[in-house]
Amino acid sequence: MTDNHGRVINYLRLAVTDRCNLRCFYCMPEEGIDWLSRKELMTFEEMLRICSIAVKMGIEKIRITGGEPFVRKGIMSFLTDISKLNGLKQITITTNGVLTAPLIPELKKLGIQSVNLSLDTLDRNRFFAITHRDEFPAVMDTMHQLLQHDIDVKLNAVVMDGKNIQDIIPLVNLTKGLPVSVRFIEEMPFNGGDSHYQVLTWDHIKILEAIKEHFPTIEKIQDPAFSTSYNYHIPGHKGSIGIIAAYTRSFCGTCNRVRITPQGVLKTCLYDGGVLNIKDLVREGKSDDMISAALINAINHRAKDGWEAEQTSTHESMAAIGG
């Protein structure tokens, strides 16, 4: 598939739930959350059909996200089903790691080669302050077990002024002894109504400057095709570093991805308000061809970049959008 700006679309991010067992303040409020009802959520059968249609249209990679995907019952059976889709080249998962460790051998058998692990700090007390849950040991256990099973690990850390700036260098230090990719992400205004977010102070330039102060030999390395991050390596380190300009939005020109929320809404940009409810089409009995045509029409009316897309959006929580 190609959009109206000539960008190839071959990557789908599918959020299977809006629920999460952590309460990271930048993602969702700690209390007063309006969870989606079971009726509003797509069933796994509906998701499988949508994924099958998408793969036939040219989607080669599917990332499973949430909320936290592993809190939804039946997720492993669903992963088994989509792993059998002919033409799908890669399945990846974004998880907070709390429930993941016992499932890693099965994930390996399913052919999962890469997992993104959300980890904003290496300090247990700060972890609790950010997530409101004391689950730091479980997340670290997941990281080490993923590496033991030869599954690529990307650590995603949201950089927040006054919250975890002191963790930037310790997280970079992880790459010295471990073959992990540590990715620092600009904070985005998707906390579902919490007013803590004011203005971005730590952009991708400032993050890199902070790292360079401690690691002056850091080198820029080639970014993979369609990469959302600026990628770096420190000589002598086993891992790498990425900086994602999520708020600055400097990667829109090569964006190859679309999102589907837990309630089946297609988002052709993280920042748009949703452009098509695919779940409704499925429940209305539309054929695969009709759904494909609706998807193509939506992709052919895609915003040029996140700034244009944001003009029509409302700031939902990241859990509801699909992290």
Residue spans of the language-model regions?
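Canonical Radical SAM [4Fe-4S] cluster-binding loop centered on the CxxxCxxC motif
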Residues: N4-M42, L270
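Accessory C-terminal segments flanking Radical SAM cores
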Residues: N191-W307
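Conserved, mostly hydrophobic/aromatic
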Residues: V16, C20, I64, I93, ...
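Radical SAM/AdoMet-radical enzyme domain recognition
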Residues: L41-I64, E68-I185
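A short acidic, helix-capping loop that chelates divalent metal ions and anchors anionic groups
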Residues: G32-S37, D123-I130, N191-S195, N277-I278
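Glycine-centered loop/turn positions within well-structured domains
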Residues: L22, R124-N125, S250, L276
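Short, conserved beta-strand edge motifs with alternating hydrophobic and charged residues
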Residues: N156, R183-E187, Q222, I243-I244
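N-terminal [4Fe-4S]-dependent radical SAM core
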Residues: M1-A15, R23-F25, K56, S229-I244, ...
